[in-house]
Each structure stands twice: as C-alpha cells, then as structure tokens.
Amino acid sequence: MRTFKNYITEQKASDVLKNWRHDDAKEYAERLIKTFREPDEVTETTLSWNSIEPPFDRVWVIDESIPHDFPAAHRDYVYSSMKIQVPTELLDILGHASGSIIYDGLKMEVTARCGTLYANAATLGFVKDLVDGKIKPNKEQ
C-alpha cells in the first residue's frame, strides 16, 4: 500500500540554491549550511533553521538582497527571531531605530533582518537591552 509520504519529494537545499537569483543570499546560505548543517525547512526561496542554539529561536535566509544604508551600506537577506515581549510604549522607538526590526505582538517575537547573524545578534541585543531598561532613549535618539 502506498502512503502519502510516497508521493512527497523532499527538496534539498543544494537543489534549491541552484535557482536562487541573489548571489549574496545564496553564498550566505551556503556558509550557514557548512556551519550549522542542512536547514530544517527548505522552500524554493527560503532556507530556515529552527535548531540553532541561542540566542536565536529561528534563523532563515531568503532569496532576496535588500539594500540598507544603516549603519553602513550593505544588503539584507538573513533573518533571526527571538521571543521578546516589547511594551507598547517602546514600539515607536523600535520603528525609528532601524528598518530591520520587525515585531510580531501576537507571537511576542522580534525579528532582525540584516546581512549577517552577528548584525542580527547585535540588533536583537539592542532590543533586549531597551526592553530591560539598560538603554534609556532620549528625544534626540
């Protein structure tokens, strides 16, 4: 008897990456595969890892290359998420801090989008410090 699983073809990261249009995102995804192993999820345009050790809950690379000029010119394609509950009064501050901070209030999850995991860690660290009161914003910020 054939089961549903017999009809499913699992995509491999290497097969999907052959068709990616953005070389910078593709090269970074390949580097993450070497460092963290094959992704947990593979689609035509996204590779994601749900099991990279903290600080991230989830990391994913999308076949995109978004120009971003803060703090210096670079391109964004890697996303990292953490569970951080952001008080409502801080949301406007986060929105103005960087276009690369995304907050999902229903999941209480903050996502950083940048060009490296290091930059995402720094961004999420900033959010955590702001929420924990270690950073006090002023009107000039």
Question: Where is each model-derived feature located?
Answer:
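Charge-dense, intrinsically disordered terminal/linker segments
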Residues: 1-10
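A cross-family detector of function-defining hotspots
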Residues: 14, 21, 25-141
